[in-house]
């Protein structure tokens, strides 16, 4: 998938795994942005600690790169317990889940990324574990098989997903705390860039941090990734200081424009304008013309374009807006202006 090649993609890249933990906040007061989510979690954590109970199960959903994994770490740190991490695709059989659950200590946090990808048979084991802190294990085979209930310690399940609509209702209803993570403001991202630069021992001027923030598509993971690229440019082409000019030159070299669009975003918009003459276009036609999978276009490329007002999803297909024409320096045909 193209997401693995995009510096402005929200999904985690291999390079992020080595650097991201060093800049990740460990306590909730260091976490920038998502004020409503922070306040709700802080309140729930404090209440659970006062009662000396486990925290209620937490579901975090929203676009990739907004801090779901970071929040799971913070929850465990604030509760003073161990964090166990896994993901939906890894838990293939009920036995895999049972092995994880039986190793938990009281009040531990179990973080399941991509929880929407759990299989139905695994979910069936998870339901009693979440509600009653028990799991049913089948011992034996055939007529001799019997179900045995095993008690497990009270724990907190933190589920993360970018596709909340794919969660089954029974699973979603078992989460006591459900929070959506929103895209970050430019000001919040500038704070994150400045904080990360300080941790990494970099010198970043406020205008330099702001320039990186503007092109980060509202996503901290992208902001930190762009910061590392600008750092390289500043050290090789400049004096090591990240200024607005250095950030602009570095990001232009990476083909990330002032609004955070990359060449794949522009390619999609130009395709709709030039090849399809701005008419409504179905997703399958776009997929064939771009040579990309439908899911990649829907989940990776389109969301940011829709959020920024460059693209509209209609029952008849995808339509490019006047905003997209202006951004690309093109004049919108009169018939399209009338349609808008």
From Swiss-Prot:
Gene3D superfamilies: 1.10.8.60, P-loop containing nucleotide triphosphate hydrolases, Winged helix-like DNA-binding domain superfamily/Winged helix DNA-binding domain
Pfam families named in the record: AAA_lid_4, RuvB_C, RuvB_N
Chain segments carrying region Large ATPase domain (RuvB-L): 4-184
Disulfide-bonded cysteines: none
Keywords attached to this entry: ATP-binding, Cytoplasm, DNA damage, DNA recombination, DNA repair, DNA-binding, Hydrolase, Nucleotide-binding
Start and end residues of each stretch annotated as Small ATPAse domain (RuvB-S): 185-255
Binding site for DNA: 294, 313, 318
Job of this protein: The RuvA-RuvB-RuvC complex processes Holliday junction (HJ) DNA during genetic recombination and DNA repair, while the RuvA-RuvB complex plays an important role in the rescue of blocked DNA replication forks via replication fork reversal (RFR). RuvA specifically binds to HJ cruciform DNA, conferring on it an open structure. The RuvB hexamer acts as an ATP-dependent pump, pulling dsDNA into and through the RuvAB complex. RuvB forms 2 homohexamers on either side of HJ DNA bound by 1 or 2 RuvA tetramers; 4 subunits per hexamer contact DNA at a time.
Family: Belongs to the RuvB family.
Complex formation: Homohexamer. Forms an RuvA(8)-RuvB(12)-Holliday junction (HJ) complex. HJ DNA is sandwiched between 2 RuvA tetramers; dsDNA enters through RuvA and exits via RuvB. An RuvB hexamer assembles on each DNA strand where it exits the tetramer. Each RuvB hexamer is contacted by two RuvA subunits (via domain III) on 2 adjacent RuvB subunits; this complex drives branch migration. In the full resolvosome a probable DNA-RuvA(4)-RuvB(12)-RuvC(2) complex forms which resolves the HJ.
Protein's UniProt name: Holliday junction branch migration complex subunit RuvB
